[in-house]
């Protein structure tokens, strides 16, 4: 039997690994050390077959190829989160004091029948109303966190405009689901919309792997698990509103991914998105009292 060196290395681990591979397919081989190197030896008669087996093994176990680098954060997102919290606090104070002698909650809550009859502004105004301080604090905290993360993908202005619209669409979807009289308030629909957007963005974080892999879907699965964990707790929890927000958030995220592919780094555009968000909220409240 004439032996030939099929592979050699200064380190023994790879040689012994390949030796086990060949043994598994019933090809005799051995590892020998000589002059500070390690050699994988096989019979010349089976060298071609052994080489093919090792080549196949290497290809099947190659590390995941990353085709592009992770996207760098476009914005830290703190400014948008600060304004989000400030708006909720201001409207909360106006509601609790019946400012301007206006019935903020009655005129602004999400009333499913009235929404279906055309009072679309309620899908927005309801996002700013809360039952108590704990309800408000929770939505400010989670909303700011998710909003900051979304902002790092597409910028603060674009992020909060998308979150606001997705939250409003979530309230609309929730109203369509109930049809009959159903009342709801709170920014949680918008919070879970942000979570849905974040889940979609996480899948497409520039990490476009060459083969389908669970790792790519893990962040999205994590956001869905988080929806189940914090979106279904409590006796007064409107589960359908949370789910509706999450669904609309996912759809909004998909729109960004497939139409724009990358974040909106244009600074003037970020201001346009931000001002549009503020204008939309103001318009909704004006219509709530005069519409």
Regions found by a protein language model. Give the residues of each.
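Short amphipathic alpha-helices in soluble, non-transmembrane regions
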Residues: 18-19, 50-57
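A detector for small-residue-rich transmembrane helices and their helix-helix packing motifs
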Residues: 12-16, 29-46, 58-291
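Short glycine-/aliphatic-rich beta-strand segments at the starts of folded cytosolic domains
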Residues: 1-11
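Conserved dinucleotide-binding and phosphotransfer motif residues
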Residues: 25
């Amino acid at each position: 039997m004439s032996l030939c060196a099929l592979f050699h290395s200064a380190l023994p681990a790879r040689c012994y690994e390949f030796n086990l591979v060949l043994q598994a397919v019933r090809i005799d081989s051995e590892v020998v050390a000589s002059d500070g190197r390690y050699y994988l030896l096989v019979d010349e008669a089976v060298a071609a077959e052994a080489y093919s087996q090792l080549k196949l093994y290497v290809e099947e176990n190659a590390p995941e190829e990353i085709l592009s680098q992770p996207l760098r954060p476009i914005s830290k997102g703190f400014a948008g989160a600060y304004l989000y919290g400030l708006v909720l606090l201001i409207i909360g104070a106006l509601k609790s004091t019946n400012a301007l002698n206006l019935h903020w909650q009655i005129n602004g809550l999400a009333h499913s029948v009235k929404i279906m009859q055309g009072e679309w502004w309620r899908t927005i105004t309801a996002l700013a109303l809360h039952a108590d301080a704990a309800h408000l604090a929770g939505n400010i905290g989670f909303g700011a966190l998710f909003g900051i993360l979304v902002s790092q993908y597409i910028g603060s202005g674009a992020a909060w405009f998308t979150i606001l619209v997705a939250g409003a669409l979530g309230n609309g979807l929730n109203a369509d689901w109930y049809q009959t009289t159903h009342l709801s308030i709170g920014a949680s629909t918008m919070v879970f919309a942000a979570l849905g957007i974040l889940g979609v963005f996480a899948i497409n974080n520039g990490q476009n792997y060459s083969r389908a892999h669970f790792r790519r879907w893990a962040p999205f699965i994590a956001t869905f698990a988080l929806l189940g964990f914090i979106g279904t707790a409590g006796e007064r929890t409107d589960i359908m509103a949370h789910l509706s927000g999450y669904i609309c958030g996912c759809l909004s995220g998909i729109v960004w991914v497939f139409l724009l592919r990358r974040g909106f780094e244009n600074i003037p555009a970020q201001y346009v998105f931000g001002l549009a968000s503020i204008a939309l909220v103001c318009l909704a409240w004006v219509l709530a009292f005069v519409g």
